[in-house]
Amino acid sequence: QFRPADDVEKKKTSYLFPEGVTDVKKSKDIAWAAESFTLKGQKYGVMHLSHPENPKGMVYSAYRDYGRFGAFFQADVSKGESLSFAHGIMVKTGDLPAREEIQELSDAFSKTVVKK
């Protein structure tokens, strides 16, 4: 998950999701979520990408005005076993890229190999 500094300007925080996602709280296994926030007068964009090989049932917590967001899932891991998952997080100064550009980044990330 990602959390900006405590003095983020809460009224300027907003989120962006893939085309068709209207309620992030009810959506599972979406490919990405993005956030725009302002800190000390500077605007930032954060893109959080989830790999398609991640455990299923993942939900994004991406609605808080103070900027904390991330992806969460539940999984049973037996003693001696491990669980692999992959997320990409990109932070940039300025405005978020357009939804289509973030989708292109997500599509490229989804083609990377996750080591098991």
Name each region found by the language model.
Residues Y44-K116:
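Beta-strand-rich recognition/accessory modules
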Residues Q1-D76:
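Trp/Gly-enriched beta-strand surface patches
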